[in-house]
Amino acid sequence: MPAQVAVSAPYYSLGMAANRPPARARARPGSLERPINARLYRGTWLLVGIPLLIAAFSVGKPTALRAAVPTLPPAFDKARATALARDLAQTFPDRSPGSPGAVSARQWFADQVAKIGLRVRREPFTATIPGRGRIQLENLIVTIPGRSPQALAVLAHLDNIGTGPGANDNASGVAALIELARSYASVSGSPPPGASIVSPAHTLFFVATDGGEFGGLGADKFAADFRDRLVTAVALDSIAGHGTARLVIAGNTARQAAPGLVETTAARIQEQAGALPRRPSAFAQLLDLAFPFTLYEQGPVLTHGVGALTITTAGDRGPPPFADTPQRLNGGRLAQIGRSAQELLRALDQGAELVQGTSSYVYLGARVIRGWAIELVLIAALLPFIIAAVDLFARCRRRHLPIAPALRSYRSRLLFWLWVGLVFEVFALAGVWPTGAALPLSPHSSAAHHWPLLGLFGLGALAALGWIVTRSRLAPRRAVGIDEELAGHTAALLALGVVGLLVVATNPFALLIVLPSLHAWLWLPQVQSRPLWVRAAVYAAGFLGPVIVLISFAARYGLGLDAPWYLAELVAVRFVSIPVFVIGLTWLAVAGQLGALTVGRYAPYPSADERRLGPIRSALRAAVLAQRTRRRTVSDERQRAAGG
């Protein structure tokens, strides 16, 4: 019997060991270590399929307008236009706003227009240019009366940056403007050679704008004054370069010219140049909708609800000022685009109402995807994050995790960033930063490259003061449990969801910038127990959207390392609106809380028992106690003296 026991005992132990559940290699889904419902997150991505299908059915091919009646061959004179451009660039190399050369150049334009029997109407105005101050500017308008008061406009900025002759940018556009006006001079006087003998259906405005190099100040003023009459507008800028023609369709808002206007312009250029003009890539178009920005004059016109585009041979930034000499003008390209603009104007005169207005879209080859369909896809891409974040919050509530201290911790970080934003805005009002109209700054200007170090030092000092006050509530004082860390993640993700909804309310296309942070940072609670480098990689992925915007400005506009300051300047001049600025600060507060969790420096907002006096109250308490001590010492000395 003892032998049987000796045999059965090991057998029994082995059997129990065989039936024991295996140790888990990873945490159970739904636990504190793996709180994100990955299955729910993956499943909600199926919701994006329906908007994608709708977007596919929204793809269409816009059609171009053609002139309703036969027209004469284009009468644009290549030699005369090239001579005008060279004369303007050589005689007035400095046409920067407010300079004597700008005044003389305006008189030169008026004289050239007078030679073809037309008159110029002067429209003076003032504007503040960052780095230059308040300056007197003037638009020059040549009007060709039509059978309708509704108007078409051709714009070309007369000014330049002042550091080069500005032959291509934009003496070429001004020369083409004069040649285009010449072909309609018969309507207002004796026709010069090559002039049209047909009165236009629409009133025509040929506008030499001022301040075009500084955000399109003149175009903005003209569009504001004539928005009720304008049907559409075309800007000519740097059209005598050696590159092929290019269409700039982006605006300063998430609106573009109607696709029919773009197609009509492209068709007229193809007829004269033998090739279609270049357009931005699909990714660049999406980025321009997410962060609307352009240096060309169609931008402010589109802001006023008037369809407009720019024809150019330059890039996003324009030609380098020092190399923009009369000797480098391409007369052949100037003639091609000039004749294209002439035929475009005739086509628009017959049917501009069919291509007026603004819309949003993205070109894919010869076809376009409608903006509303893209917005629908982007909003649908927000849903997986929202649903997963709400599910995480519900799980935390069921576990009775301390969400309130985590929300208060986020509130403290948000107040810190709002303090930094308030100081920045106060400095802007005080003139510490260069200020001006709410338009893009010239990348060539000193304001775009000069960092006001003294002002930035003051901003940093006041920000540090705000952080010292805030840090007393955020510094870890004890070991933080995994439940408190999860609550901190949940509070930050809820705030991030609010940021996403606010972006939808302002500009749904801007979700392109925010979505990487939403979908990357959602998984930070899931990797909280992983090594630091894993957490840091997931955290860094959330900055992909803002980094792409920063790189885009640095590369496309030649800003390089000055791109961060340039973006800050856009905030200072209110090109970036206050609501968008506040949304950005809210996003930074989320990044701050998640960053603290990533590196293990997070602490929930302290309870009343844990709370210490802040630095200000501590200093006041120390001062009061010191004053009481001094008074007590003086009183004791007086009593001893009286007793002695």
What are these regions (language model features)?
Residues 42-58:
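Hydrophobic membrane-insertion alpha-helices, especially the h-region
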Residues 375-644:
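Alpha-helical transmembrane segments of integral membrane proteins
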Residues 6-35, 624-643:
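N-terminal Lys/Arg-rich, disordered targeting/topogenic segments
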Residues 62-361:
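Soluble extramembrane regions of membrane proteins in the secretory/endomembrane system
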Residues 27-41, 405-410:
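Short, Lys/Arg-rich N-terminal segment immediately upstream of the first membrane anchor
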Residues 313-386, 572-573, 578-580, 584-604:
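His/Asp/Glu-rich mid-to-C-terminal helical/loop segments that flank catalytic regions of hydrolases
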